[in-house]
Amino acid sequence: MTNQSLPKLTYTGASKSAVPIISESELQTVTAEPWLKISDEGLQLEGLVFDRDHNLFLCEVFGGKIFKVDIDTKKVSTAFQSTKQNPAAVKIHKDGRLFTCYLGDFESTGGIFATDEHGEQFEEIISELNTEYCIDDMVFDSKGGFYFTDFRGYSTNPKGGVYYVSPDFKTVTPVIQNISVANGVALSTDEKILWVTETTTNRLHRIQLEDDGVTIAPFGATIPYYFTGHEGPDSVCIDSDDNLYVAMYGQGRVLVFNKRGYPIGQILMPGRDEGKMLRSTHPQFIPGTNQLLICTNDIENDSEGGSMIYTVEAFAKGHESYQFQ
């Protein structure tokens, strides 16, 4: 038998893509459109959040800048420079303060600090001096407490977890532990379901909570979805129908799940099949609308496309969370 007559594998269909979609290929799929270029450089953008005046804030993890965007003019400015290492998320308290999560050295020096929008009136909320958390993200509940994710560990060393901080910021209570690189976190509209992404094991956690917000209901901790591919699920947000939007880091897309954890749609970044704009990190709604923004960058493509925010219309309007109450 000659080589010419052997059965041959060829790159066809999905196998031509730098990031093939296999198990979700039949989902309703849309491709996002450009909304705003933040920088010509490849910046690790994260933490999209809006204040009451509908100004957009976001952070750049490795460089430490906190950006502010006027959504009417789309003017981008630097709100302040983080004094802490590797800021990974920004959330806004009902009183208007910005709460910034930072990863520190990715091992033992992360925390959360609060400031005004100019980076002033600094207050340490979770101190790196007396904890070992590597804090990636957080979500407020209606009482003013919050859940945060501990980003530590890796696939065979599950050191991460999710913790609840009381409204007075004095008590930290573990909710789930022993997971690998806890990343995105969101609460359902009724605050009964806590969603958590576990990046390095490619898992989605759905946690049903008791009324105290920290006790897991009987049989309430489940993993409704296992993701595939490199790298894994990142930050998340919910809409008013309780659908969950999960950014897929390293894959240039966002997957959408219904309130029971079933995938119902996906949003693709332009150029992903050619390996462009793959570092999709965070989805967030423009308040009062169903317009979803998604930040990503082109670092894996030698930063050719810079750092972008893309947009689509989602299934429903975004859920108006704690800062708008």
From Swiss-Prot:
CC terms in the record's Gene Ontology section: cytoplasm
Intracellular or extracellular location(s): Cytoplasm
InterPro entries for this protein: 6-blade_b-propeller_TolB-like, SGL, SMP-30/CGR1_Lactonase
Pfam families with a match to the protein in the record: SGL (PF08450)
Database matches in SUPFAM superfamilies: Calcium-dependent phosphotriesterase (SSF63829)
Cofactor binding notes: Binds 2 Ca(2+) ions per subunit.
Class of the enzyme per the UniProt entry, highest EC level: hydrolase
Residues binding Ca(2+) 1, per UniProt: 46, 136, 183, 234-235
Domain of life: Bacteria
Function: Exhibits lactonase activity. Acts in cells with perturbed membrane integrity and is possibly related to the membrane homeostasis.
Family per record: Belongs to the SMP-30/CGR1 family.
Protein name: Lactonase drp35
